[in-house]
Structure formats: C-alpha cells, structure tokens
Amino acid sequence: MSKSTIRIATRQSPLAMWQALYVKEQLQIAHPSLVVELVPMVTKGDIILDTPLAKVGGKGLFVKELELALLSSRADIAVHSMKDVPIDFPEGLGLVTICEREDPRDAFVSNHYDSLEQLPAGSVVGTSSLRRQCQLKALRPDLIIRDLRGNVGTRLSKLDNGDYDAIILAVAGLKRLKLTERIRSSLSAEQSLPAVGQGAVGIECRLDDHDTQALLAALNHADTATCVKAERAMNTRLEGGCQVPIGSYAIWQNGKIWLRALVGSPDGETILRGERLVSPEDAEQAGISLAEELLDKGAREILTAVYQGNTAI
C-alpha cells in the first residue's frame, strides 16, 4: 500500500474525539505501520448553542467544515456520527465505511426518577431533537419539553444544576464516554424509535482516493452498513435532514431486515408509522417504499411545516 499516513478530520467534542480515536485505533490494528493523525476542528453546530437545532436551519451543521478539509486535502478522511450525516454529499466526496453499531437506543437520564413512566406530570425534560420531542409528547403529553444544547458533559451539568427533571441522550454516546452509570433506563424502539444511523460511526473520504478506501475496507461492518443504508434510503426519499422529526431503525431478524420508520408532528399529536420485513438485498428499496407509504399518509405536510419553522421546541 503506497499510503503511509492518514489524517482524520474530526470535531473537537469529547464524543467526536472518541470516535476519531476509535477509527485511528482500528486502522492501526489493521495496518500496524500506518501513521494516523487527527485534525480537530469546530463546526457551525458546535458554535451556535443558543438556538434550537431545528431553527438553526441548513443541513450538515456538524459536518460541513470537515468536508471542506477533505476537499482542500487538509485531511484524508472525516469521521462522523452517522445520525449527523446529511443525505447528500459534496461532489467528489462519499460515505465509504460504516463501522459496527453500538446500542442505538435513547437513554433516560435523571437524578430523581428511574424511568419516563415515573416522571410526575409537569416535569421538565430536555432534548434538542424534534424526533425525541414528538415521541415524548405522544407518550406523555403532560410533560414540558425544553431545548437542550451542548456536548454530553454540558447537558449532564444542566441536569445536575436542576434545570431539568430528566434529559434524553443517546445510549451509545454515554457508553463511549464511560458514563453508563448515568443511564437510569433505556427507551425501547417502541417508546422512542432511534434516529437514522444512530449508534453507528461513518467514514467519509474523497471518492478518487482509492488508496485510502482500500485501507478503510477492514473497518466496514457489512451487517451494520446494510441496516444503516436502508434507514438512509428512507430518509433520502423523505428528503429529511438531521434535525427533523424522523425516526428509522433497521435490525437483522432471522436473516431478513426489519425496518421501522416514523414521521411525527413536533407536538406529538400525529405520529405516522410503517415497517417492512425484507431480504437484505431489498433493504434500500424497502426504505424507499416505506418513505412513500409515509408520504401517502401525510408526512410531506408535517415536514413542510417543520421546515417553515412551525415547531414547538
């Protein structure tokens, strides 16, 4: 292999750095002589912390600066949390590797209550996600949902300071940061369907950089990739972004792919759901047909209202 060094573009948050260091470690296990360097940077999503994500607008809030580093050859690969990766890529770039998925569920985190069911009426729950908000409001319309921004540590500090009675975070992020003890319970997919790609780490690079792609091949987890691609196919057909009330989750079940999806109004009053059970080779097409089913049920109207800023969070 002619390439001796790989530079990884990454956000500077603790969780993003964990992901980049994980990819570095896996690359060096697969290729012991390879030199791997990190190129930390700050994204728009890291800077704008006083506005709910759904109102910031635009796609790629957490990836654009990393992609510019790839296009200018300041980095060879960019490591992303798959739930933050937009459906479209700049010309010349693409998603080439999806690593094995961690637990994709949402975590219920509280200092006083063990579960969502235990929260008294009127409790304040923090989340920056319209996907989580719509499902929480559908389950518990008596709760008050308030915006919660910042990295994992910042969000936990706000909980500890008494700003919230509970917050919802990703199980995967808490596990990776060795904060599992903060998880009071994990929400089932029936309670809170995960985001597209949640729990998976993806690697983006220049499509003409075949040497780098060859090095990355060892990190691709085929079973995870099949599931995430089905979820993303659904999201692509819906023309969904990362900050919209869309959930999609695929798992392997007896050799087939079970794909579930939802689109919800932010107030939780309307939740459109659908599912498919298909052979792996049909997984992406199933994502498309599932999206079309949701569109037929009224998903377009819900998403249009969200894009126009009619959100409650």
From Swiss-Prot:
Annotated pathway: Porphyrin-containing compound metabolism; protoporphyrin-IX biosynthesis; coproporphyrinogen-III from 5-aminolevulinate: step 2/4
GO cellular component: cytoplasm
Domain of life: Bacteria
S-(dipyrrolylmethanemethyl)cysteine modified-residue sites: 242
Coiled coil: none
Keywords: Porphyrin biosynthesis, Transferase
Catalyzed reaction equations: 4 porphobilinogen + H2O = hydroxymethylbilane + 4 NH4(+)
Keyword Transferase: yes
One Pfam family hit: Porphobil_deamC
Family according to the record: Belongs to the HMBS family.
Protein task: Tetrapolymerization of the monopyrrole PBG into the hydroxymethylbilane pre-uroporphyrinogen in several discrete steps.
Note: The porphobilinogen subunits are added to the dipyrromethane group.
Assembly information from the UniProt record: Monomer.
Protein name: Porphobilinogen deaminase
